[in-house]
Amino acid sequence: MKWVKVTASVILLSLSGCGSEHLSHSHDHHAQAHHIANAAVLISEGETKIMFDPLPLSGFGVYPETPQSDIAQMMAGEGNYAGIDAVFISHAHSDHFSAAAIIAYMNAQPDVTLVAPRQALDMMKKDQDWDGVLQARMRIVDMEAGDAAETITIGDITATAVRIPHAGWPAPKRAAIQNMVYRVTLNDDATVIHMGDADPRRQHFIPHKEHWDETRTDTAFPPYWFLTSSQGSYILSDEMNVEKSIGVHVPLEIPQELKDSGQDYFSKSGETREINVERSPE
């Protein structure tokens, strides 16, 4: 081992620099977003972990699907998927949700809480492997568009759910879908939003302005079409009080308009982003 001699003044200077750096960043915190596939995202902050839409039935050849290796790790509770606290389902469309897969996952991971719309529960109840005992570990949101936000608390996780119409509204089949926008705060620290397949029209978001203003969102995960329109971008930054957005639900063939937008988005399984949380000193 080589020993390097340094003067006392250098040591003091180094310590001084470290101290000032520590002070300048003492109110910066970090969480991480891990892209699973399509609209599926894993969020971790310390020991707290949540997933959004992790087990879709199919991508229908249009959207990327959750890799089989990731599914195996989820079921085993290994790797990135060890210690998951809660799973949030945005809506009961097959490119976001599989009743059979979620039932299997809940049976394999008995400590996980599921947050889902009523329509997802209805589909699970029709599955041959449904067991009513699972419902005790579920938080079901059943609301109409325009209803006030509902608050859900799971340990160190505080979430709200707001029903925002599915893209394609007001077509009846789209309007009937319970599409949930979740705002989730982990450990009273990092706050994220997942939007499912929300329709990008301001009229859906304006009635909830007070709700959005209550909490600054560090990172939102909107469907990519919010990032390719001026109205969608305005909704995120000005209506929803979002600091940063990362697009999801990106097709296998990435739209050129998204490539040209300069916006950040997830398109490959395993991509990660740091979620920077900046809070003012108290």
Regions found by a protein language model. Name each.
Residues K2-S9:
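Sec-dependent signal peptide recognition
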Residues L13-P67:
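Zn-dependent metallo-beta-lactamase
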Residues A39, S58-G59, H93-F97, L121-M124, ...:
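Active-site environment of divalent metal-dependent phosphoester hydrolases
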Residues T48-F88, A100-I102, D199-T215:
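Pre-active-site segment of Zn-dependent metallo-hydrolases
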Residues F52-L55, I84-D95, V115-R118, I193-A198, ...:
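Active-site neighborhood of phospho(di)ester-bond hydrolases with catalytic His/Asp-centered motifs
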Residues M75-A145:
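Active-site HxH/HxHxD metal-binding segment of metal-dependent hydrolases
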Residues Q128-G155, Y234-E282:
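Binuclear metal-ion centers of metallo-dependent hydrolases, dominated by the metallo-beta-lactamase
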Residues P165-E239:
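Active-site-proximal loop/helix segments of hydrolase catalytic cores
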